[in-house]
Amino acid sequence: MTAGGYTLLDGLRLMELQMNKRQAADLTDSVTCLREGAPFYQVLKSLSFHKEAVGICYFAETHGELPASMIQSGELLERKIAQADQLKRVLRYPLFLIFTVAVMFYMLQSIIIPQFSGIYQSMNMETSRSTDMLFAFFQHIDLVIILLVLFTAGIGIYYWLVFKKKSPARQMLICIRIPLVGKLVKLFNSYFFSLQLSSLLKSGLSIYDSLNAFKHQTFLPFYRCEAEQLIERLKAGESIESAICGSLFYETDLSKVISHGQLSGRLDRELFTYSQFILQRLEHKAQKWTGILQPMIYGFVAAMILLVYLSMLVPMYQMMNQM
């Protein structure tokens, strides 16, 4: 709407007509805050918008391109929602199968396996090694579940008591070292940093002033700390491309893009084009891993179902052979 000539307040009033009561009440409060002089990004933050979307609008108010940046933040949120919906569709049926097989495992452990074991003991039959292994598995499955619960609880405790107390740079370093996840984190860092730096440079700000814009925001602590580090290195006489090149948090080709952009005199354009390439790579990797995850889950479910059948058939065949 703002791109079509509406003021921000007029656009919000029109949106209010299409919302439910709770959303309309939030929007009314937002309009009041804007009239009182609150920045638009603070209004979004108070409404619990995604922090990356809030960040985009913060930088937009710095360089004066709020309509275009609102479109960018909307597209970012739409992509995140679409990826989350795709993941839900992929996982919905496999998770239902896992739940069903888990119920079957419980019935086997609590009813069927004890009956087979009692029959073997009452008839003085010897069990084969495969049957012993199946019985032992179901006898100790509770221990496996307890260990999984303890492991999950341990991760939660570590996150709240240790991870959250670390510095933003240290938190990001831990995330980057996680297999598979780390590559996606580096790609997103490169995408977000290059896109926002491009917008700030396009508005006429210098690299130093653009980094100061990153430094003075409060809702993206990692980028604030990164800006502080980069500013200190620039003051020491180091170029921004060499400072980025030595960082573990970005793709290695980001520094090359910055160097090429400075040589061509169109750093803002080079960074924006690079950010779109990175966005395509992110979407490709998300689709790739979603496609890999579903067959893996189906394979796990198939193995569980096979184990269920073996646990019932193997003891029966052995009993028939010994009779």
From Swiss-Prot:
Cysteines engaged in disulfide bonds, as pairs:
none
What GO terms in the biological process aspect are recorded for it? establishment of competence for transformation; protein secretion
Location in the cell: Cell membrane
Mind listing the UniProt keywords for this protein, alphabetically? Cell membrane, Competence, Membrane, Transmembrane, Transmembrane helix, Transport
Provide GO CC annotations from the record. plasma membrane
The regions listed as transmembrane in this protein's record are 93-113, 143-163, 296-316
Q: What membrane topology term does the record carry?
A: Multi-pass membrane protein
Q: What does this protein do?
A: Required for transformation and DNA binding.
Q: Which family does it belong to?
A: Belongs to the GSP F family.
- The protein in question is named ComG operon protein 2
